[in-house]
């Protein structure tokens, strides 16, 4: 548990440093990192259930994507689905922590949520390609 807290603090410090630099792709992921950070203990297998903060964060991301993706009532075609997907992918790749595929796949079910975007270890964010969002281009 203590090592987990140290890793989370280190990740937040790195994120703050990276986010403060101009034109850094991570600045476009800040909201995703903050929303998904409370889920780390669950997806790493430390906790059996996601915390309420984790579920609130995933719900927030789901709402961001839901109201900006093609087919939604408030369609803006802004590329938010791809941005959120890429940010989660970056966080998973950068963390080098042992994410449990089953925990990631069960996150929506455990939070009683139907996601508007995929969360899995095999995410393919290219299926949400949107060239209209300059933030997405900076992440690629």
From Swiss-Prot:
Q: Name one GO biological process term.
A: pollen sperm cell differentiation
Q: Which gene encodes it?
A: ATA7
* Presence of the UniProt keyword Signal in the record: yes
GO terms under cellular component: endoplasmic reticulum lumen
Q: What protein name applies here?
A: Protein ARABIDOPSIS THALIANA ANTHER 7
Lineage, opening ranks: Eukaryota, Viridiplantae, Streptophyta, Embryophyta, Tracheophyta
In the UniProt record, does the keyword Disulfide bond occur? yes
The entry lists its GO molecular-function terms as:
lipid binding; lipid transporter activity
Q: What compartments host this protein?
A: Endoplasmic reticulum lumen
């Amino acid at each position: 548990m203590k090592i987990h807290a140290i890793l989370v603090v280190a990740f937040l410090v790195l994120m703050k440093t990276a986010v403060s630099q101009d034109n850094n792709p991570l600045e476009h992921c800040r909201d995703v990192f903050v929303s998904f950070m409370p889920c780390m203990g669950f997806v790493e297998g430390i906790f059996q259930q996601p915390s309420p903060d984790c579920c609130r964060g995933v719900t927030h991301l789901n709402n961001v994507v839901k109201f900006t993706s093609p087919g939604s009532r408030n369609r803006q075609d802004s590329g938010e689905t791809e941005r959120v997907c890429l940010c989660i992918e970056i966080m998973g790749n950068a963390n080098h922590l042992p994410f449990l595929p089953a925990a990631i796949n069960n996150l929506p079910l455990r939070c009683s949520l139907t996601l508007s975007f995929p969360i899995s270890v095999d995410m393919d964010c290219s299926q949400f390609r949107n060239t209209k969002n300059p933030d997405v281009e900076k992440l690629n």
